[in-house]
């Protein structure tokens, strides 16, 4: 059910994203995701370039979609902001979205978000296949409630609380995380790429 714009990012109150198996009780909400693009930290120009590539070519609501996507990021600035644990494919840092200026600003923004004490961003190198290439996903739950998985495809988004689906996606995340660079190495890489590639 749902659509790519109907996942946990659009419903932070109902699905304050958290993953019980990746946190200790009482640590508050957390957001754990694997992604092929830096959606939680997208700049306006980057979001606009991504959304402009929709296959239906319908740009009538582009401004509205961009504004909605940026508004969802406000959850990260709250005092009660969730813990964010995001694993990005290295290709995100090198794929030309919107041109050099857009990419440089986007990676500076990503580096800024990575400095937030509630945020962990790791980069997985592009040297081979990994489970994160199969789908964009978010694992989410509320304290005391069963975890929920949001899976996004090119056609739609799907939310499920199936225990088997949650277990499968959680295992995928663990495997992706095991192959990713450390937080410190990832941070330095995110800082370095704009100067080396997008000048």
What is the predicted function of each stretch?
Residues 18, 24-199:
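Hydrophobic protein-protein interaction segments
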Residues 1-22:
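Short amphipathic recognition helices of helix-turn-helix/homeodomain-type DNA-binding modules
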